[in-house]
Design a protein with these regions (language model features):
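Short, structured beta-strand-loop surface elements
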Residues: 59, 66-146
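Short, flexible segments with low predicted structural confidence
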Residues: 15-17, 46-47, 81
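Short, flexible turn/loop "capping" segments at secondary-structure junctions
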Residues: 28, 54-55, 85-86
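Alpha-helical membrane-targeting segments
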Residues: 1-33, 111, 115-128, 135-137
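Intrinsically disordered, low-complexity segments enriched in polar/charged residues with Gly/Pro
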Residues: 22-27, 38-41, 61, 68-70, ...
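N-terminal short leaders/motifs
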Residues: 1-13, 35-40, 89-100
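Short beta-strand segments
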Residues: 31-66
Length: 147
């Protein structure tokens, strides 16, 4: 079950996200970053946001550390988008990962990006117990990315 949760970015976080997005647009990936482009669910216009692309167990995933963001809502509505890095564009279909399958993906995400996202997860650390991660899993949508 998904629990509605959203952590609004601070001014400093918006500035940092803008910097990461600019770097990704010119082809520089900061520790796996990409620009996610997805059509707006109401406007149909392309909307972009920097994201961390997780490669885990032979698949690619997008995790929403801030919860029910606009990109999450748009991706749920469209089911597809693009990951951009410089001039490269990877069109994909998105499948939301169910609660029963989130644990290993969230654990891998936290292991890689804990330093960056810890403030969005109410956890003791990246090596938190399974039960602790399962408790907050509903607040953080996860999508499998299939080219």
């Amino acid at each position: 079950m998904s629990v509605r949760h959203y952590a609004r970015p601070t001014a400093v976080e918006r500035l940092f996200n803008s910097l990461v997005a600019v770097l990704a647009r010119v082809g520089v990936s900061v520790y796996g970053s990409r620009v996610l482009a997805v059509r707006g669910r109401k406007s149909g216009e392309w909307r972009t946001v920097p994201v961390n692309l997780l490669e885990h167990a032979g698949a690619q995933y997008l995790v929403a550390p801030r919860g029910e963001t606009e990109w999450v809502r748009n991706l749920r509505a469209s089911g597809m988008g693009e990951l951009r890095l410089g001039r490269r564009r990877q069109a994909f279909r998105a499948t939301e990962v169910g609660a029963a399958d989130k644990l290993p993906v969230l654990r891998a995400y936290l292991a890689k990006w804990w330093f960056e996202v810890k403030q969005f997860f109410e956890l003791s650390g990246p090596d938190a117990a399974d039960a602790e991660i399962e408790r907050i899993a509903g607040q953080h949508p996860v999508f499998r990315v299939d080219a």
